[in-house]
C-alpha cells in the first residue's frame, strides 16, 4: 500500500467506509504494533473486523479498548454491535445505552439501539430510538426506512408510510427502502402502489429477498396467486432461512387452498423462528380447519402472543378440562359476538357435568344467555370487572373450552339449538311478517363489518336480485348497520323489496335479532353474527362462505354442513369475490324449499 500521510486511525476509518476492510485491518494492526494502548485505534479495528464477520476478534478489540478508555463511546458501540450479532441482544442493548450515556448525540448508536430493541420485542422503544437518530442526523435514509418498518409493526400505518416515503426521497437508489415502502403500501391497502415500489426495489437489486416477499404479498391481494407464489419462492431461494418469507409463502398457499403445503410452510417458519406468533396461529387455524383438533387447539393458545391480541382478562388458575362436580368456573368471552355465540355451544357440557359456571359476556348477549342457560350465572361484561376472582376455583376463556371438550368431529353434539329467543317478541314479529300471505319468510344478511376480512366475506345486496325474485317469499332484512341506501337502490333499479323493521337495532339489540331470526322460516347469510345467531337458535340457515381469504377456520374445509350448527348448510365460494355461482345455487334451492312448503 502506498504511503499515506494521514494518521493510521483516520486512514483505517476511511478504508472501512470505502468497504476496503482487509486493507483497513492491515493498516490498523500495523499501527497498533507501535501503539498498543491506542483505544480509539482498537475501537476502529473492532469496527472493521465486525464488518468482515470476524466477531470474536472484534469483540476482543472492543473490550480491550474499553479497558483502556472506559469513556470511549465508539468502543461501547462496537461491543454492542458484536454482542447483538452473536445473539446477546440484551447485553448489546446495555452497551448501546452506555455509548449513549457517554455521547447522547451518537446517531448511529441510537439507530443500532433501535434495531436491538426491535429484536427484543420492544417496538415502542425501537421507534423512540430511531426518532432520536433522525433528529440528530435527518439525512440517515436507512434509519427513516427502519423507522417506517417499526411503525408498521406498531400499527401506525400512516406514519410508517410517511417515513418510508421520506427514506426513498433521501436515497432514491436505496433498494431496501423501496422494499419497505412497498410493505407500507401493502399494509395501507394500496396494493398497486405496493407492487410498483417492490418492482422498483428489484430493479435496483434483484437479490433482495425482502422485496420479493413483499411483492408476493401485494400480488396476492391483487388476486395474482400464481405470481405471488413464484415471488415468495424466489425470496426463499435467496434466503432459505427467512422465517417471514416462509410464513408469507404459507399465506399464499393457504389462499390457494393448498392446505397441506401451507401447514408445511408454517411448520418450517416456526422451526426457523420459534417466537413467530402469526405463523403458529395460522398453523393452528389450518389444522383446526382440517379437523386436526388436538394439535390445532393446543397451538390456538398462541393467539395470546399475537401483537394485535388483547391481554387476558383474567389470569388466575386456568381450567384444564377437569369435569369435577361443584368446581366453580368463571368463563369469559374474549373475541367478537359471533365467537361468543359459537363457543357458548360448549357450556351445556360443563353444566351437565355438574360444574358451577359463571359466564361473563358482552352485555348485548346477557339476557339471551340467561334465558338459554338458566342453570348458570350470567354477568354482563363491564370495566372494571363485575366479578371477584376470589369467588372461583378456576377460569377459562370461552374459546379455550374446545381444547378440552371438542377433540374430534364426533364430540360435537347434534343439537336442535341451544339459544332461546324471547317468545313474546318472536310471536309479534311473526304476526307482522306473515300478514301478507307469503309462503315462506326468509331472512337475509349480506355483509360483514370485520375490518380485516369483511370485504372478502361480503356480498352486495344487488347481487341477490335473482334470489329475491323467487316467488312466494317475503324477504326480511337481518343485516346490521344502515341498509337504507342498498334497499332503496334495489327497489329503484330492480323493483325488488326487502322488508325492514325500523324499530329493531340489529347491531345493539341482539335479543331483537334472535327473535327476528326465530320468526323466519329460513335464514340466508354471509359469515357474520346473523349466521351464528340463526345456527345457535337451530333455525335452518344457509351460509355463504368465502373460497379461502376471509374463511374462518370453524367452517372447516370441504364440508357443506357445520359441525357447530346442525341446522346449517354451507355454500362455499369457488372463486374469490365472485358469488354468482353460489347465489344461483341458492336461488335453485330456495325455489325447491318454497315448493315443498
Regions found by a protein language model. Give the residues of each.
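Alpha-helical solenoid repeat scaffolds of the TPR/TPR-like class and their adjacent stem/linker regions
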Residues: 1-597
Amino acid at each position: 500500500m502506498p504511503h499515506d500521510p494521514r494518521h493510521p486511525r483516520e486512514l483505517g476509518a476511511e478504508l472501512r467506509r470505502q468497504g476496503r476492510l482487509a486493507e483497513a485491518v492491515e493498516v490498523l494492526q500495523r499501527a497498533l504494533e507501535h501503539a498498543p494502548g491506542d483505544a480509539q485505534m482498537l475501537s476502529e479495528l473492532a469496527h472493521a473486523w465486525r464488518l468482515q464477520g470476524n466477531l470474536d476478534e472484534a469483540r476482543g478489540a472492543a473490550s480491550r479498548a474499553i479497558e483502556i478508555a472506559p469513556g470511549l463511546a465508539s468502543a461501547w458501540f462496537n461491543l454492542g454491535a458484536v454482542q447483538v450479532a452473536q445473539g446477546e441482544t440484551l447485553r448489546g442493548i446495555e452497551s448501546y445505552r452506555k455509548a449513549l450515556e457517554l455521547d447522547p448525540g451518537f446517531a448511529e448508536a441510537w439507530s443500532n439501539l433501535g434495531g436491538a430493541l426491535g429484536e427484543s420485542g420492544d417496538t415502542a422503544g425501537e421507534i423512540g430510538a430511531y426518532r432520536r437518530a433522525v433528529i440528530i442526523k435527518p439525512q440517515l435514509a436507512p434509519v427513516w426506512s427502519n423507522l417506517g418498518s417499526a411503525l408498521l409493526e406498531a400499527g401506525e400505518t400512516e406514519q410508517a408510510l410517511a417515513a418510508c416515503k421520506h427514506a426513498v426521497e433521501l436515497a432514491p437508489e436505496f433498494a431496501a427502502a423501496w422494499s419497505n415502502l412497498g410493505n407500507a403500501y401493502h399494509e395501507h391497502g394500496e396494493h398497486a402502489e405496493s407492487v410498483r415500489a417492490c418492482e422498483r426495489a428489484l430493479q435496483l437489486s434483484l437479490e433482495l429477498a425482502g422485496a420479493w416477499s413483499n411483492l408476493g404479498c401485494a400480488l396476492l391481494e391483487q388476486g395474482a396467486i400464481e405470481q405471488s407464489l413464484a415471488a415468495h419462492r424466489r425470496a426463499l431461494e435467496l434466503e432459505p432461512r427467512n422465517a417471514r418469507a416462509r410464513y408469507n409463502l404459507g399465506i399464499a398457499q393457504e389462499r390457494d387452498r393448498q392446505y397441506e403445503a401451507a401447514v408445511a410452510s408454517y411448520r418450517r417458519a416456526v422451526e426457523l423462528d420459534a417466537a413467530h406468533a402469526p405463523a403458529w396461529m395460522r398453523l393452528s387455524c389450518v389444522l383446526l380447519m382440517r379437523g386436526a383438533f388436538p394439535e390445532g387447539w393446543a397451538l390456538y393458545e398462541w393467539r395470546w402472543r399475537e401483537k394485535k391480541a388483547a391481554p387476558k382478562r383474567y389470569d388466575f388458575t386456568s381450567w384444564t378440562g377437569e369435569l369435577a362436580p361443584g368446581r366453580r368456573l368463571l368463563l369469559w368471552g374474549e373475541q367478537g359476538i359471533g365467537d361468543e355465540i359459537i363457543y357458548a355451544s360448549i357450556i351445556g357440557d360443563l353444566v351437565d357435568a355438574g360444574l358451577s359456571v359463571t359466564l361473563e359476556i358482552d352485555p348485548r348477549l346477557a339476557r339471551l344467555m340467561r334465558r338459554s342457560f338458566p342453570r348458570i350465572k350470567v354477568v354482563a361484561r363491564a370495566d372494571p370487572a363485575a366479578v371477584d376472582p376470589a369467588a372461583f376455583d378456576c377460569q377459562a376463556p370461552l374459546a379455550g373450552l374446545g381444547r378440552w371438550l371438542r377433540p374430534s368431529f364426533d364430540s360435537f353434539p347434534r343439537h336442535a339449538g341451544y339459544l332461546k329467543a324471547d317468545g313474546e317478541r318472536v310471536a309479534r314479529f311473526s304476526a307482522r311478517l306473515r300478514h301478507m300471505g307469503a309462503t315462506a319468510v326468509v331472512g337475509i344478511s349480506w355483509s360483514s363489518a370485520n375490518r380485516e376480512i369483511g370485504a372478502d366475506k361480503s356480498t352486495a345486496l344487488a347481487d341477490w336480485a335473482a334470489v329475491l325474485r323467487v316467488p312466494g317469499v317475503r324477504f326480511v332484512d337481518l343485516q346490521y348497520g344502515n341498509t337504507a341506501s342498498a334497499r332503496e337502490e334495489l327497489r329503484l333499479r330492480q323493483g325488488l323489496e326487502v322488508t325492514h323493521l325500523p324499530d329493531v337495532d340489529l347491531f345493539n339489540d341482539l335479543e331483537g335479532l334472535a327473535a327476528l331470526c326465530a320468526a323466519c322460516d329460513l335464514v340466508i347469510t354471509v359469515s357474520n353474527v346473523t349466521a351464528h345467531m340463526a345456527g345457535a337458535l337451530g333455525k335452518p340457515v344457509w351460509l355463504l362462505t368465502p373460497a379461502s381469504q376471509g374463511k374462518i377456520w370453524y367452517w372447516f374445509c370441504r364440508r357443506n354442513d357445520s359441525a357447530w350448527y346442525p341446522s346449517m348448510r354451507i355454500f362455499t365460494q369457488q372463486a374469490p369475490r365472485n358469488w354468482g355461482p353460489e347465489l344461483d345455487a341458492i336461488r335453485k334451492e330456495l325455489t325447491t324449499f318454497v315448493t315443498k312448503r
